[in-house]
């Protein structure tokens, strides 16, 4: 046990016996660097290793290479939207346990609490240098900032908004919605910000459409500089790079504008592929690629898939859910199932795939195991340790179920290959006003849930409750186990934008 692990174990034993559990590290091996690259609204069927890429009109050669050198998770499950999925990833908990089960928008009160324990804190406590460059989207209150939750450095968009905020000033000016001079409006609009641990947010420059188009170049440059500094200092690092690849409006950089055959969304996919390659090249140049675990995943399904099914082929940011139904904001398989590739030379077998059910929450305890640090025991941790899946020692993993929430509602459950819906999520409006995805409405089912077999029917076209009603029992058991945890650990108020 090295010095950091010994101090962590002693601290856990002497200071917080009731609040943490130390997971066994991998037999006295050197701690790996960890790089987690998170795409935004990129669908299961968008990239080459999952049936997209060149076939879809946007080649992704560096991502294809990453898959050849690592492990493809083919049943990687997330939450239905940006904020919920990022909250689940960072805390190892269902987003509703932190009141973050709706996408944060400007003016909403949802924000990450002081008591939350994040992945940044896991790594920081294990002696890692930590940084996030890009989109946090878990709140901008001082107690919610990434630098208040274990990250040494942050550079990106405001922590309570998303990439589309680059259009706010333009749309306000166009509609004359505010009686504010343009220059003053620009100064008051969204800003690129930065912070270091213990310090406040500092404004860098306005976040305009022009900045939006080139922002990922900046984020990768910041990431490269961070890794070089930590290599020089001889310190292990955790780099979290939630960049803009896939999120509307997909304004490509000048280098990639017009490169794909499918418009700006494809251009941005190709640009993102280039940036993934830059990160991999930097690791190799630094001589740390064999010592670095790289994860590349998406936060949720794409925008626009349901619009395509309704006959709208003109959405410029329309992604592809592959064989699955649904999109960003729903609880359908196409919303919560997306790609994830893991590479760790010498540890993760190259050119492999796993069908084990793997939740984004599972990275929290899995990373804790790999770096020999602690996970909290004073709260439910919904993630499970999936180290054996990553290392090829288990085909099935430690998970066979998952719940899905939207706002205050538990809307669906997965158990093995079965999906059960407790609410009926449908697009709102009719005709041109028909809005799917995150603008859908939900209504309670009239007594019985909908049930689908995802393996036989990935598009969820055929309800099978009549033939397979027995599956309700195991899924209700999953629900009841979750409800039991609420007796000791009740959830805070869920995100809400419609019920006052």
Where are these regions (language model features)?
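Formylglycine-dependent sulfatase
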Residues: 2, 7-16, 25-445, 449, ...
């Amino acid at each position: 046990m090295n010095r950091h692990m010994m101090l962590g174990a002693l601290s856990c034993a002497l200071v917080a016996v009731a609040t943490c559990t130390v997971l066994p590290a991998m037999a006295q091996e050197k701690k790996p660097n960890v790089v987690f690259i998170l795409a935004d609204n990129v669908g299961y069927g968008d990239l080459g290793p999952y049936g997209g890429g060149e076939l879809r009109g946007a080649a992704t050669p560096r991502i294809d290479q990453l898959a050849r050198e690592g492990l493809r998770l083919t049943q990687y499950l997330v939450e239905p939207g940006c904020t919920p999925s990022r909250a689940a990833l960072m805390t190892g908990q269902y987003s509703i346990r932190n009141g973050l089960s709706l996408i944060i928008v400007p003016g909403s009160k949802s924000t990450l609490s002081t008591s939350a324990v994040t992945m940044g804190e896991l790594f920081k406590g294990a002696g890692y240098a930590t940084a996030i460059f890009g989109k946090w989207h878990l709140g901008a209150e001082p107690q919610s900032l990434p630098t208040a939750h274990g990250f040494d450095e942050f550079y990106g968009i405001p922590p309570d908004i998303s990439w589309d905020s680059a259009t706010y000033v333009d749309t306000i000016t166009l509609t004359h919605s505010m009686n504010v001079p343009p220059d003053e409006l620009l100064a008051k609009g969204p800003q690129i910000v930065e912070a270091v641990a213990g310090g406040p947010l500092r404004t860098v420059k306005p976040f305009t459409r022009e900045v939006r188009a080139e922002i990922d170049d900046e984020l990768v440059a910041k990431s490269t500089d961070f890794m070089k500094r930590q290599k020089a200092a001889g310190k292990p690092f955790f780099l979290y790079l939630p960049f803009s690849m896939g999120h509307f409006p997909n304004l490509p950089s000048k280098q990639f504008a017009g490169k794909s055959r499918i418009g700006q969304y494809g251009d941005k996919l190709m640009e993102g592929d280039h940036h993934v390659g830059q990160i991999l090249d930097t690791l190799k140049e630094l001589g740390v690629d064999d010592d670095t675990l790289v994860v590349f995943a998406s936060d949720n399904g794409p925008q626009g898939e349901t619009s395509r099914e309704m006959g709208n082929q003109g959405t410029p940011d329309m992604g592809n859910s592959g064989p699955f139904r649904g999109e960003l904001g729903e609880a359908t398989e196409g919303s919560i199932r997306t790609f994830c590739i893991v590479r760790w030379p010498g540890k993760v077998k190259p050119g492999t795939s796993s069908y084990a059910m793997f939740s984004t929450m599972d990275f929290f305890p899995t990373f804790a195991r790999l770096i020999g640090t602690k996970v909290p025991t004073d709260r439910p941790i919904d993630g499970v340790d999936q180290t054996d899946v990553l290392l090829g020692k288990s085909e099935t993993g430690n998970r066979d179920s998952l719940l899905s929430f939207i706002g205050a509602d538990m809307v669906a459950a997965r158990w093995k290959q079965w999906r059960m819906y407790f609410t009926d999520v449908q697009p709102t409006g009719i005709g041109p006003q028909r809005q799917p995805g995150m603008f859908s409405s939900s209504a309670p089912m009239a007594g019985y849930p909908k049930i689908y077999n995802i393996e036989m029917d990935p598009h969820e076209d055929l309800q099978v409750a009549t033939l397979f009603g027995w599956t309700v029992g195991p899924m209700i058991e999953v629900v009841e186990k979750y409800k039991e945890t609420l007796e000791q650990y009740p959830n805070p108020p869920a995100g809400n934008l419609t019920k006052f």
